[in-house]
From Swiss-Prot:
This is Ribosomal RNA small subunit methyltransferase A. S-adenosyl-L-methionine binds at H10, L12, G37, E58, D83, N108. SMART domains: rADc. It comes from Synechococcus elongatus (strain ATCC 33912 / PCC 7942 / FACHB-805). NCBIfam families: ksgA (TIGR00755). The lineage of its organism: Bacteria, Bacillati, Cyanobacteriota, Cyanophyceae, Synechococcales. Keywords: Cytoplasm, Methyltransferase, RNA-binding, rRNA processing, S-adenosyl-L-methionine, Transferase. Specifically dimethylates two adjacent adenosines (A1518 and A1519) in the loop of a conserved hairpin near the 3'-end of 16S rRNA in the 30S particle. May play a critical role in biogenesis of 30S subunits.
Length: 279
């Protein structure tokens, strides 16, 4: 069956890359795994051979029949039809102990919805997903992998880097060239491994931190203090910067997660009375 462009389908055919993905998941026989977008089942076959329960969510109705015919007799296989962003898959398997509460996610996800899928799997700073997955092994566009795994000071480091790394550690597993797919995509790809933190870094007001990140990264070319002046007075900003060893000329992409948390704590909630209109 040919890949469908409207679903962002590119079949991963490299045996070596498939093996790397499975190895990165560090599967145990007792594991229950969620696979998003099983496609034609190349990765599915490997996962079924390694774990006690596999829940696969597929949107393409034509593929559903093929997958059911190929794997439907396997007792450790549960196939759900629907959009992973809209389907309440947790409710669909809640009364099936063999599949309920998967601890790991393995997926070759459509690149055009990577952000929403990450949010559905990790949650947000203000509302982390609970219970958290133990490990997520995802095949994503290289540009996205660079942003997710970037460290302070790197060009790719931004609000997405902070939001994801607040919730999980991120590391690259391997690069995946276009020739590894059929049809080949026009972009480079990377396998990444996310390990959600059992309890994210302590922040006394996660909602405020979300707002602070939005404002801080609103204009990356500007100094951070200028981006924050619409929320806080110059005196508040200078005091918080000094307390967390942040240079006056620092830009948002140079701050560590701990420094962002420190700013969030020290600056408090922005109020009209705190704004210095002449700053």
């Amino acid at each position: 069956m040919p890949a469908r462009k409207r679903f962002g389908q590119h079949w991963l055919r490299s045996e070596a890359i498939l093996d790397r993905i499975v190895a990165a998941a560090e599967l145990r026989p007792s594991d229950r795994v969620l696979e998003i977008g099983p496609g034609r089942g190349a990765l599915t076959q490997r996962l079924l051979a390694a774990v006690d329960g596999l829940v696969a969510v597929e949107l393409d109705r034509d593929l559903i029949g093929q997958l059911q015919q190929r794997f439907g007799q396997a007792e450790n296989f549960c196939l759900l039809e629907g959009d992973i962003l809209q389907l309440d898959w947790t409710a669909a398997i809640a009364d099936r102990p063999r599949f309920a509460n998967p601890s790991k996610v393995v997926a070759n996800i459509p690149y055009n919805i990577t952000g929403p899928i990450l949010q559905s799997l990790l949650g947000t700073i203000a509302q982390p997903r609970r219970p958290a997955f133990e490990r997520l092994v995802l095949l994503v566009q290289q540009e996205v992998a660079d942003r997710l795994c970037a460290t302070p000071g790197q060009r790719a480091y931004g609000a997405l880097s902070v939001r994801v790394q607040y919730l999980a550690s991120c590391e690259r597993v391997c690069a995946v060239p276009p020739k590894s797919f059929s049809p080949p995509p026009k972009v480079q790809s990377t396998v990444i491994c996310l390990k959600p933190r059992p309890w994210p870094q302590v922040c006394n007001n996660p909602g405020r931190l979300e707002k602070l990140l939005n404002q801080g990264f609103s204009a990356k070319r500007k100094m951070l203090r200028n981006n924050l002046k619409s929320l806080y007075s110059s005196e508040q900003i200078e005091a918080a910067f000094a307390a967390h060893q942040i240079a006056p000329e620092a830009r948002a992409e140079t701050l560590s997660i701990d420094q962002w948390i420190g700013l969030c704590t020290d600056l408090g909630d922005p109020t009209d009375s705190a704004i210095n209109p002449t700053a």
